[in-house]
Amino acid sequence: MKKIFTFTLLFALLNICVSNKIFARESNPDENRSVELSFSINWTFGCYKETTFSNLSQDLLAPRFQLDTKIISGDFLHKITADYFFCRPKSAMTQTAVVYKNFDPITGETYYEGFKSNLSFHRIRLQYDLANDILKNDRFELYVGGNFACNAFLQFEHYPSITGLLSIGPTSAFNYKLNERNSFSVMCSLPLFGYGIRPPYAGCDAQLMKYAEESFMKILTLGSFLSLHNQQAVLLDFEYKLSASDHFSVGLGFDFEYARIAVPKEKPLYYVDGNFKTTATVKF
C-alpha cells in the first residue's frame, strides 16, 4: 500500500506542476509550434496467453497498423496514438480438424464430431500523452508527463471474449538530433491505475451481452479497479527518422510491449509483443 500511495502522490504532483505551467504561461504567437502526422506498418512477433481460453497463442509477422499525431506547442508535447493488431494464432486446433467425443442428452448416446477452430485475436489501443520538456538544447529534448489509454483485447471463437481497460500513468520521451536530416527518439509509458472489464472465463460474456442489449452503461459495473497489484505493463518505442525534406520524413523503429492483467487472479491475461515498423511522417 505504501508503494501505491507513493506512486499516486508523485503522479498527482507531476500533473499539478504541468497544469500550473500550462495556465501560468502567457500566450506567445512566436512560440514554436509543429504538427506531425505519422502512419506506420508494423510486423509483429509475439504471443499472448489468455488463460480463460487457452494456454498460449502466437503468430509471427502479423501486420499491425498505427496512426500517430504529435503536436509540439511551446514546451509541451501532445501525442495521440491509435493502433490495430489482428492475427489468427497458430496452434494444432487452428491448423487441422480435431475429432472429439460428444454426448447427446436427448438420446443418451455418444457420437464423434469434427471441429476446427476459427480463433482470431484483435487488439485496439487509443492513447493520449501530454508531456513537458524538462531538459532541452539544440540537439536533444527530454519530456516528462502523463498518459491516458484505452485498450481492448478481443478474442473470437464462435463467441466473443473481450477485455477492456482504461488506465492512466506516467510517460517520458527523449528526442536526439544526430544532424540536420537524422534523428532518434525513445518513448516509454507505464499504466499505474485503471479500470478493467474482463470475463472470468471464455464464454462467460452472456451477462455482458445481456447488459449491452438492456443498457450499455451497465457493462461498467462488471469491472475491477486496477493497479500494480493486478496489472503490470510497459510500452517502449524506439524510432530512427530520416528527413527527406522540411515536411516529409521516413523512419524505422522497434516497439516492445508487455502486459499482465490478473483479473481474475487465477486466470490472468499475458500479452508480450515486439514489432519492427516502417513509418512515413508529414510535418506542418
Regions found by a protein language model. Give the residues of each.
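Flexible, surface-exposed loop regions and adjacent strand-edge segments
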Residues: N55-Q58, Q95-F103, Y159-G164, Y201-M209, ...
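Cleavable N-terminal export/targeting peptides
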Residues: M1-S38, F284
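Outer-envelope beta-barrel architecture signal
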Residues: E31-F39, G74-I80, D138-V144, E180-V186, ...
